[in-house]
Amino acid sequence: MDQIVLALQTRIALSEPTLLEGSVRVVQTKQGPALAQGAHRVRQIQFDLERCTVYLAERSREAQPMIYSSAEQWQNAPHKRVVLFGMSGLGKTYMSNILRDTGSWFHYSVDYRIGTHYMGDYITDSIKRKAMDVPYLRELLLSDSIYLASNITFENLAPLSTYMGKPGAEANGGVPFQEYRKRQEQHRRSEIAALLDTPEFIGRAEEIYQYDHFICDCSGSICEVVDPFDRDDPVLKSLSETALLVWIKGNAAHTQELVQRFDKAPKPMYYHPDFLIEKWTQYLADQTLQEHQVNPDSFIRWIYAEALAHRQPRYEAMANWGVTVDASEVARAKSEEDFSALIGQALATKAAP
């Protein structure tokens, strides 16, 4: 695990073979589409001792256009629009809540939009299926005597995560893998739709509710539903044309904390379909298990560190569409002024030669 954290934190120059000797070896190289004039390469690194996979990338040297080109333009903007992205637990919702509480920022939660608008019927139907197994509730439900619905809030997304579930033995609360993949695909489509709704909500926030500023609080899985290596990705183009993308970047200590937190309370999450199938197949082979024998919590604990490593180069590529702030600095921000200064500094840093 320490080697994974180190690899995530360390900038490895892939053009220097000597840095790949010893504990790691290149097992696969993927050439992604060019970002502007620079190519973005992703390499899969496998640790010889721990059979863990780390994905690393060289960032494109060519940044994408942003709606704020300088710190001065940002500070003087009458309407500030920001899209926060990064791993769950690094401060997106924390900062969004601070800004929302000022009364001048509209808080658009992508997870909330997914759970209430796009996946609300799926969630409600799953609740009704369980209710139909209880004779007392079945009778009331069939006679329209009761109303069943989830109660999702910005702070409580349990209905959504419970519906997403964990793959594995049903006796242990798991979901059959094919059903799990279906729900993952539902989430993928829903997240893309919710992200594409952002410009509409920017307009509604200003025109209807008279908010001066807008903060979009993205799901941690945004990097899995867009192609950050494609400068023509429709979702990233839509977002970057209407708001400033801001990556909240963690370090090795943050990664270790996230892993420890997840180990204590493993929660469902979305994975890129190719990555999920690859890791599911690997887990079954390594553990010599059939699908119905998999302990759901054991599997998602095992895949979590792999998922962090898989997402890192995708976040890196997304950073070309905006700016980067450190998660430690976000944690120290206590006000709108702190946040505004943080973004201004990030813009100044990016503009520096």
Label for each model-derived stretch:
Residues Q287-P353:
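NTP-dependent small-molecule kinase module
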